[in-house]
Every structure is written in C-alpha cells, then in structure tokens.
Regions:
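Short hydrophobic/Thr-rich beta-strand motif most characteristic of the beta2 strand and flanking loop
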Residues: 25-39, 46
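Alpha-helix N-cap recognition
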Residues: 39-42, 164
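Conserved binding/recognition cores within well-folded domains
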Residues: 115-160
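CheY-like receiver
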Residues: 45-127
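Single conserved hydrophobic/aromatic residue that forms the stacking wall/gate
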Residues: 158-168
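Short, well-ordered amphipathic alpha-helices
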Residues: 15-24, 43-44, 71
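Conserved acidic segment of CheY-like receiver
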Residues: 2-22, 56
Length: 168
C-alpha cells in the first residue's frame, strides 16, 4: 500500500492528478490510497492525526497555508516522504531546495512526465521500504523484505516431453 496526498487549491488539478494516479494504479496492479486536500492546513491536520504519506503532490501558492510552509512543517516531522511540487511558479525554486523536493512539475500537467516521475517515486519508495519485486512465470510478485526470513534458490529441471519445471 502506497499512501499519497495531493494538495492543490485548484480543484481541476487535484482531480486530474487523482485520475492519473488511478489509471497508473490500475495499469500496474498497485495499491494506492489517495487523500485530496485544497490547502496546506488540511494536509497538516491529517499528518497531525497520524497519517503517514509516502508521496505528496504539492502546489506552491495556496490560500491558507502555502506549499513551502506546508513542506517545512512536513519535513520537521518526516524527512523521508517524497515531495513533488506541481506549480506554475518556478520563481520559488531556491526556497524549494530547503525542503528537498523529489521533483518539480510545471502546470499544465504533462501525462508522460507525470508517469515518468511517478515511476521514479515508486522505485524510490520500494527501495526505501525494502520491497523486492520479481517476475515468476507471467506474474510480478512483491515481497516485503522485513517479512523474509531467508531466500533459498533451488532449481529443478526435469526433461519430460520437452517441458521445464521450476520450483519456487
């Protein structure tokens, strides 16, 4: 389960990001929870109640609590959450470095760029959480490393009518 927050005062952008996330989740058979916020104070309140996010999409200029103040608050509690800024304002780039964003995306959102950044974020989240993914037959299996006692590789090949047998 990957917990994602989207925080933007533009409802159309929030809906658009949510739609892209749902499409990505369905296409890749992943499990997301997505919380939507229209300002930084709502996101801050959710975090104060104990919600932990892996990835946050954040606008810079919002009414009650802007994206930079929100990110500073988030970083004071969680240094590992990935922040992707989605904004029309690139004149804040120097200030953004203080909160160590993962990526910056300009509006309007480019789907290809969005998915590229999301791929990178998912890879980073998986490696940080100790998740190991591997292909078995035609399926992609996922294992949480902290749940693994040990790995053992045993491969049997039986030639019976030109069939190969694999035991996992």
């Amino acid at each position: 389960m990957i917990n994602i927050a989207v925080c933007d005062d533009d409802l159309e952008i929030t809906k658009s990001i949510n739609k892209l996330l749902m499409k990505y989740q369905d296409e890749r058979d992943l499990d997301f929870t997505v919380d939507l916020f229209n300002d930084g104070s709502g996101l801050k309140s959710s975090i104060l109640k104990g919600k932990k996010y892996d990835l946050i999409y954040l606008d810079i200029e919002m009414r009650q609590m802007n994206g930079i103040a929100t990110a500073k608050y988030i970083r004071s509690i969680d240094t590992t959450v990935l922040l992707i800024y989605v904004s029309n304002y690139d004149n804040y780039l120097k200030e953004l470095f203080e909160v160590e964003p993962f990526r910056f995306m300009s509006k309007p959102i480019n789907d290809k760029r969005f998915y590229m950044f999301l791929d990178l974020a998912i890879d980073r989240i998986r490696s940080a959480n100790g998740i190991y993914c591997f292909r078995f037959n035609k399926d992609i299996l996922t294992v949480i490393l902290r749940d693994v006692i040990y790995f053992e590789t045993v491969s049997y090949t039986h030639l019976r009518a030109h069939e190969t047998e694999l035991h996992l």
